[in-house]
Regions:
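Cytosolic juxtamembrane N-terminal segment immediately preceding the first transmembrane helix
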Residues: 1-22, 26-75, 90
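Transmembrane-helix boundary and interhelical linker motifs in polytopic inner-membrane proteins
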Residues: 181-183, 447-449, 487
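Short, charged juxtamembrane terminal tails flanking transmembrane helices
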Residues: 244, 526-533
C-alpha cells in the first residue's frame, strides 16, 4: 500500500473517531441537560411541596393572640377614652385641647417606647418582655380606676402606653421570626386584626358601658382580660432566637423622646396660640412655647440621627432609611394612620358636639367602619401573598380617600347615618391597603435589620396617631374658640365648621401618603428592571 493511501485511511479513521467523539459528547451533554432539567423540576416541585406543606403551629397562634391582646387592650382603652372626651371635659373641667392629652400622651408613650423595642428584643427574652408589658398594663389600669385628678389619669396613660409599646412590636417580631415564609402575609394580617379590632369596638364599648356604669368600670373589666393574656402567653411563648449583650445608649433614648414630645407639643401649642388669636386673647406666650417646642423637637431629632450614625450600637439602625423605597413607605406609614386614628376622634366629637347625639350613639357610629376594617386586614395580607405589593396597596389606599372627601362635601349637612356610612367606606379600603405597607417595606430590609425596621415603622405608626389626634383636636379647638359654651347653637355650628376643616386636611394628607407609596413602587420597578407585582 502506498504512503498516500495510508495517510488517506488514517484521515478517514480520525474523521470517524472525531465524529464518534462529537456524537457521544453531544449525546452526553443532551443527557446531562435533560438530567439537570429533571433535577431542577424535581427541586422546584419539592420546594413547592415544602412551601405548601408549611403549617402554622398552635403555639405560634397562641403567642400572637397573647401578646396582641395587650396591644388590643391598650388601643381599646385609647379609643374608649376618645368617645368619653365630652364627659371627661365636664368632670375634670378641662378644654378640648387639654382633654385630648388622654389619648395623645398614651400614643406618645407608645411611640417613645417603640425605638427601644429592637434593643429589648436583642437583650431580653420574649417571655420577660411579655410579663413586663402585662405588669405595666395592670398597674396603669389600677391607677385609672382610683384616679380622681386629671394629672393622675395622664400618669396612668403613660404607664399603659409603655406596656403597649413593648407588646406591639414584640408581636410583629414573633410573626417575622417564627412564621413559615409562605404564611407571613397572612399572619401579618392576623396581627393587624388583633390590633384593629380594638378601634372597632372601643367607642361602642365606651358608650355602652358608660350608659349603665361609671367610665372607670372599663378598666375593671380590662384586668381579667390582661390576666387571661398572661396565662396564654406563659404557656405558648417560645424563644427561637438567642439573646445577646446589646447596649442601650441613654442619650439616644433621651433624644428620641424629646424629639417626639417636642414635635407633638409644638403642634398642640400652635393650635392653642391660633385659638387665642381667633378669640381675641393674648397669644404671645403660646407662640413662644410653640417655637421653643419646635426647636427642641427638631434639634433632638437631628441629634438622634447624628448619634445613631456614629454609635457602635445604635438604638435604631436608621441606615435602612437610606433606601428611598423604605423611606417613602415609612412616610406613608406615618401619614395614613395619622388620618385613620384622628378620623375616629373627629367623628365621635362631631356627633356629640355638633349633632347632639349621646355617647353611646357616637361610639356606635364608628363600629361598622372599624369592624369591616378589622375583618379586611387579614384579607389584605392574603392579597399580598397572592398578588404582590402594588395592587393590594395602591388601589385600596387610593379609593379610601373617598371617605373624607364625602365627609367634606356634606360637612355642613351631615347626619349620624352619613358619618357612619362614609367612615365605613374609608375603613374598608384603608384596612386592606395599610395592612401591607410595613410588610412591603420590610421585604426590602435584610433579615438582621428587620427588628430595627419593625421598631421604626411602629414608631412612625404611633407618632402619626399622636400627631393626628393633636392636629385634629387643635383644628376643632380653633374653630370652637370664642363661639360660646358647649351645647349652644353657635358652638355646634363651629364644631361642624371645624369638622369640615379636618376633613379637608385628611384628604390632603391621604393624597401625599398615596403619592409616597406610588413613588416607592416606581423606584422598585426601575431598580429591579422588571415589573413588580
Amino acid at each position: 500500500m502506498s504512503e498516500n493511501t495510508k495517510n488517506m485511511n488514517t484521515k478517514i479513521t480520525d474523521t470517524k473517531n472525531e465524529s464518534n467523539i462529537t456524537t457521544n459528547t453531544n449525546a452526553t451533554n443532551t443527557a446531562n441537560t435533560t438530567n439537570a432539567a429533571s433535577v431542577a423540576k424535581a427541586g422546584t416541585a419539592a420546594a413547592s411541596k415544602s412551601t405548601a406543606g408549611e403549617k402554622i403551629s398552635g403555639r405560634l397562634i397562641g403567642s400572637i393572640v397573647a401578646v396582641g391582646s395587650l396591644a388590643f387592650i391598650g388601643i381599646l382603652t385609647e379609643t374608649v377614652m376618645t368617645v368619653l372626651f365630652p364627659a371627661l371635659m365636664r368632670e375634670f373641667n378641662v378644654t378640648t385641647s387639654t382633654v385630648q392629652w388622654i389619648t395623645t400622651i398614651y400614643l406618645l408613650s407608645v411611640a417613645a417606647t417603640m425605638p427601644v423595642s429592637s434593643f429589648l428584643k436583642r437583650r431580653f427574652k420574649i417571655k420577660a418582655l411579655f410579663l413586663a408589658a402585662v405588669a405595666l398594663a395592670l398597674i396603669g389600669s389600677l391607677i385609672m380606676i382610683v384616679a380622681h385628678v386629671f394629672p393622675l389619669l395622664l400618669i396612668a396613660r403613660v404607664i399603659q402606653g409603655i406596656g403597649s409599646g413593648i407588646a406591639t412590636p414584640l408581636m410583629i417580631n414573633i410573626i417575622l421570626e417564627q412564621s413559615p415564609r409562605s404564611k407571613i402575609g397572612r399572619l401579618m394580617g392576623v396581627g393587624s386584626l388583633v390590633i384593629t379590632v380594638a378601634p372597632a369596638i372601643g367607642p361602642t364599648v365606651g358608650g355602652a358601658v358608660t350608659s349603665i356604669l361609671p367610665w372607670r368600670a372599663i378598666f375593671v373589666i380590662a384586668i381579667p382580660l390582661i390576666l387571661l393574656a398572661a396565662v396564654i402567653g406563659c404557656r405558648c411563648l417560645e424563644q427561637k432566637v438567642p439573646t445577646e449583650d446589646a447596649y442601650l445608649e441613654p442619650l439616644q433614648l433621651t433624644a428620641i423622646v424629646f424629639a417626639l414630645v417636642g414635635l407633638v407639643l409644638a403642634l398642640n401649642q400652635g393650635g392653642v396660640a391660633v385659638g387665642k388669636l381667633v378669640s381675641g386673647a393674648n397669644a404671645t406666650a403660646s407662640f413662644i412655647i410653640t417655637a421653643v417646642c419646635l426647636v427642641v423637637g427638631l434639634g433632638s431629632l437631628a441629634l438622634f440621627a447624628f448619634m445613631s450614625r456614629r454609635a457602635f450600637s445604635p438604638l435604631l439602625r436608621l441606615g435602612i432609611l437610606r433606601d428611598p423605597v423604605v423611606l417613602l413607605h415609612a412616610v406613608a406609614y406615618t401619614l395614613m394612620p395619622l388620618v385613620a386614628i384622628g378620623y375616629g376622634y373627629v367623628i365621635t366629637n362631631v356627633a356629640q358636639l355638633s349633632l347632639g347625639t349621646s355617647t353611646f350613639v357616637a361610639g356606635a357610629l364608628v363600629l361598622p367602619g372599624a369592624l369591616i376594617g378589622a375583618v379586611c386586614a387579614p384579607l389584605g395580607g392574603w392579597f399580598y401573598d397572592r398578588f404582590g405589593a402594588v395592587k393590594p396597596i395602591l388601589i385600596p389606599m387610593g379609593i379610601a380617600v373617598l371617605g373624607p372627601t364625602l365627609m367634606l362635601v356634606f360637612s355642613m349637612r351631615l347626619t349620624a347615618a352619613m358619618l357612619a356610612g362614609f367612615y365605613f367606606v374609608f375603613g374598608f379600603f384603608y384596612a386592606i391597603g395599610n395592612a401591607n405597607v410595613m410588610t412591603s417595606a420590610l421585604s426590602e430590609v435584610p433579615g438582621v435589620f428587620k427588628p430595627d425596621g419593625n421598631a421604626i415603622f411602629n414608631t412612625c405608626l404611633q407618632f402619626g396617631g399622636a400627631a393626628g389626634t393633636a392636629l385634629f383636636a387643635t383644628i376643632l379647638s380653633v374653630a370652637q374658640a370664642g363661639e360660646g359654651k358647649e351645647g349652644s347653637a353657635s358652638f355646634a355650628h363651629a364644631t361642624a365648621v371645624g369638622g369640615a376643616w379636618t376633613f379637608g386636611t385628611m384628604i390632603l394628607i391621604c393624597v401625599i401618603g398615596w403619592t409616597c407609596l406610588a413613588t416607592a413602587m416606581r423606584i422598585r420597578v426601575r431598580r429591579s428592571g422588571r415589573a413588580v407585582r
